[in-house]
Amino acid sequence: VSGNSREIIRASSLWLSGTPMINPMAKNRFFFEIGSSSSLLTNNRYKYPNVDIGIKVTKNLSILNKVFGFKADNEYPQIIGAGLQYYFGSRDSLDWSATVQRINLKGLKYFSLSSLSIDLRKWYYLKSYKFRLGIGSNYFKERTHTNTDVLPLLMKGQTNYLGFDFSLPLRTFNLGLEN
């Protein structure tokens, strides 16, 4: 099995595990986050879109949703999944967030990928800048649809990660960077 194939599966799984930066202290009930992720693997650059929708159902709980598709070469992958983001901390700050989400990547010719992510982050504020710093764990399962020497029939794994997010307000939008 190609090491490059395993890297692509792990990178795709980490891409699916991205959590939206929903400010627990914001008054908004609906959040829409759009962006792009890129990774450089063995001299190949991969770009993936990110679309996250969040609905704040209570002061300390949001429902997350990822449902979108895109064109990549001659394939049309679909991203389908949901999760919960829970905020806790002192009554006035809610400066911690815990996220659990399950996301599936379907529609590719050779494989499909399922991802379960658990993420814990702390919010920090510096003037109008917002930061999140935390840890997470991503559990994934890849299934190959056709017999190929490049991908295993089934690949399972876990990736632990450190997360850092940054955003700054720009009129009615927030401009940010996530890893």
Regions found by a protein language model. Give the residues of each.
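Residue-level signature of outer-membrane beta-barrel architecture
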Residues: 55-59, 86-88, 122-124, 166-170, ...
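Transmembrane beta-barrel domains of Gram-negative outer membranes and organellar outer membranes
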Residues: 1-91
